[in-house]
Amino acid sequence: MDQKTLEKFQNALSNHRDILLQWLNEDSASKDIPFGGKSVNEVDHILSDLKNALTRIDEGTFGNCEMCGGEIEKERLELDYTTHVCLDHYTSEQIRALETDLELARRVQKQLLPCCLPELPNIEIAVHAASARIVGGDYYDFFTSKDGHQGFVIADVMGKGLPASLLMSNLQASLRLLGPEYETPKQILARLDELFRNNLKLIRFISIFIGIIDTKNKILNYSNAGHHPPILWNNTKKKIRMLFPTEPAIGLTKDPDFQSKTIQMASGDILLLYTDGLIESRNSYGEEFGESRLVEFTIKHSNKDVTEFLDELRLTAEKHTREFQDDLSLMIIKIR
């Protein structure tokens, strides 16, 4: 396993451990409510598994099969960091159970994505979603805010397989319920954080970008909770602006102070939203697609309509990476 991948596992496991320890150290009254549906004893068991996995990283044995010493599939480690053996040593019953979970995850993910795009004055929208071999937690959707403006969201649930897909379904249901109840992204994020705080401590976290556009006045109001920064092309100034996170991802901090920002947009402006499946994809030399390549692409193709822009971006990404290891989700919004 390469060093960068190992560091990602180590950081994720450490964050997971720290959140559990924080909960265990809280006063006893707060533990009367099961933690993500788990009792204190169950959380202790999960914490022990996390510590063992981190120990294996320190010892240099994480990801190695205990039976043959070979490398365990990275995708399976993302599904379950406690995995000790490679697929070659799974029983036929274990393999069938794994395949059933993965197929169900694919079905859940497919059914969650919107069947059609909003038709709006002054706005063009195009989207693309492709699942990797091991289904992850990418999600995008649209909603109408309380004051009648167009809302949109792109998110990534950290994790793989059925747990990520099921959490994604909860996220969809919550957003479709909360979106019409509030006027700003920060209000929606605050409620989402309240709803997901306990469950997320066992699924790690959700990075999410929520935007609401006043299509008549071309005003964008947004909040970015730990998601990769969308790229905004300012057609008037011919400049790029990165919409960096306004707060951490949901589930990483206790009682975050969510913020919203407002941008006046104009005709020809483009907003590109994406998940890490794009920028972290690697070519045969191990080079990531990266944000800088994405910025260069946006500048070069800013004169295209959203469909042409999306098609060209997909082709460019596929030339760079033959097989994506993570889900790939893209959303392009252009002001007419």
Which residue stretches match the model-derived regions?
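Active-site-proximal, acidic helix/loop segment immediately C-terminal to a metal-coordinating Asp/Glu
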Residues: P163-E181, R241, M265, D269-T321
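Cysteine-rich micro-motifs
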Residues: L79-S92
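Short, cysteine/histidine-rich loop/knuckle motifs that typically chelate Zn2+
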Residues: E66-C68, D88
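Short metal-coordination and nucleic-acid-contact micro-motifs, chiefly zinc-binding Cys/His arrays
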Residues: D58-F62, T82
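Cys/His-rich microdomains that often coordinate metals
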Residues: I72, E93
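… and, occasionally, acidic/histidine-rich disordered N-termini of signaling adaptors
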Residues: Q94-I270, E323-R336
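Interaction interfaces in information-processing and related assembly proteins
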Residues: M1-E59
